[in-house]
Structure formats: structure tokens, C-alpha cells
Amino acid sequence: MKKNSADYYQERNLKNLDRIDSLLEELPFFCEDFLRGVETRTSTLTRLNYVYDLRIFFDFLSRRKLRGKSIREITLDDLNEVTDTDIEIFLSYLSNYRFGDKRLSCDERAKARKLSTVRSMFKYFFNKGLIDVNNTAKVATPKLHEKEIVRLENSEVSTLLDTVEYGSGLSDHASGYHDKTKIRDTAILTLFLGTGIRISELVGLNNESIDFSNNSFIVTRKGGNHAILYFSDEVGDALAAYLEQKKNDPKVPDEEPAPLFLSMQYRRITVRAVENLVKKYAKIVSPLKKITPHKLRSTYGTALYRETGDIYIVADVLGHKDVNTTRKHYAAITEDNRRSVADKVRLHRPIDED
């Protein structure tokens, strides 16, 4: 049966907006003004994350600085009383805090994101002349330690794809579903490893997104922009095999747009399902690396940089707006290079070499 509905991204945005509207009822009235002010330059997901961060910040103010005031009672005048010391105490508080009935903890990266949200709000109202001071600018951003790229080696990539194809190492429970899902799972993992696609982009693909005549497909990038990505024959073969399986399955619903990847319930596969799928196979191949879809993207980015040596191509294909983001992750000396130079410096040289 045909289904006339908004596409995946429109549906996702509507869900985000509904969630934002619901959460705004817990926040001070002026938060709605802030979100409206940044609407044209932010995605719905960014604004939803702003709301999550602000809930924690105002809960902190209500508990620690403005005792006796509920979150809804906090005013812009109260923001004028927030000092840089208060913000620093907030960042320290995030190391071990209670929110609702949960005990939570933020690492430095999460603290930096929450500080960025609070800064954005204060800057917005300060620039509008609605508050007199913006002390958030005086607070140093938590220092972030560079994380080494976690990726699969070439041999591990081959083993991973073999594991998907043959099901070796799977639990008895997972093995029971393997015959039904292995063609789909092979297509998903091959697409990750062969194109560097983001998980949100993969989940949002429709049948019509794929153009086999040009070995290409259209993705919706962060911010809603569209981009054309290209794939190899190996990726194309995996996609074609999955589409053929779907074509011959009478349970596949007739709907428009038709989601490319389906769950066992014949609905568009979810981000969580893809994360679990990757985890299921990757822990067999490389249990210590904790491979995620994003790390499969890193695997592709590393391989592409090795092959081309061109950081700009890698940035373009991965959809990085700032090439410095790419350079930071992929232009470092690779593990193989480190190994190859390990014996270049000799501590004991024959006398005649000096």
C-alpha cells in the first residue's frame, strides 16, 4: 500500500521539535526566545541538545545559587547575578551530579559542550541588551585531550566482512537470525567501510537514493545539505544483492519513499539497531577496540588518506566543513609509519660510522 508521508529527515525534525516544545515547559520562559533567535543557523538536533544542556544548567542554579526558586521562576535578572565563579562551580559540579533520580558524570568533552551552550545563551541575551553582563566569556574551556583514532586494520576489515557473511563466532541467539539478515548486514558494513558514510546518513537512505548507473548515492548532510557520494563496484555489488533480496520478499511494504535498510519488522532501521549490529560483529573481530559506526568511518578516512595523501579530498568526501577537523584526525603519522621507523634510530653504532 502506498504511503504518502514526509521523508525520514522531515519526520526526525518534527520529532525533535515536539520534544523541544515539551521540554521548554520545564525551562524559564526566556529559553523559548533564545531558541527562536538561533533557529535559522542551527538544526533541530542542535537546539534539542541546547535544551538538554540548559535543563541541567538551570537545575544547578535552582539547587545551588537561587535556592527557593523553581526553574520556571528564574528570570533574566537572575542571569545578571551569575558570576564567572558560578560557571566554574557548575563545570566542577558536572563531574558528579544528580539529575532527577539519576547520578551522572560528564567528561571534559561533555563539560565543554555544556559550557558552549550556556555561553551561546548568555551571548544572545547580552547582544540583545536584555542582560547587562556576560561572565561566561571569562571562563576557560575545559582542556580536551586529543584521542588517537580507533580504526580497523586492513586484515580486520576482511575478517569483519567474512564474519558477517559466514556468521562465525556469533552467539546461538544471533546465529538464529543470521541467514535472514546477513545480506542486509553485509550491505550496511560494506557501505560504511567503502564510503565513510555517517550513521544518520545511512539510516536516512531510500531506495531511490541509489544510482547504479553512476555508482553514486545522495545523502543529507548535517545542516540539511545534500551531497553525492560515489562507491566502488564492491559496494555496488553488496547493495544490489540486498535490493534483489528485498525485491523478492513479499513482506516488504510498498511505500514511498521506500527506506533502503529495513529492520526485522520491515520498518526503516533505526540508529540504535545499526549501532547494535556493528557492535555484534565487531566485538568478535576486535573486542578491545570497541568499534562503532563512527570508527568504521574513521577506518575509511584513514584508508583514503593513505591512498591519496590529499587531506582536502578526505575532508570533502567525509563532509567536513573545516579541513582542520580532517587534518587533526587523519594527517598524523599512521601506526604503520610509527612501526616502520621504530628501528631507524640506532643507539649502538659501530665506531667507524661516526
Name each model feature, range by range.
Residues 1-354:
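Conserved catalytic core of the tyrosine transesterase superfamily
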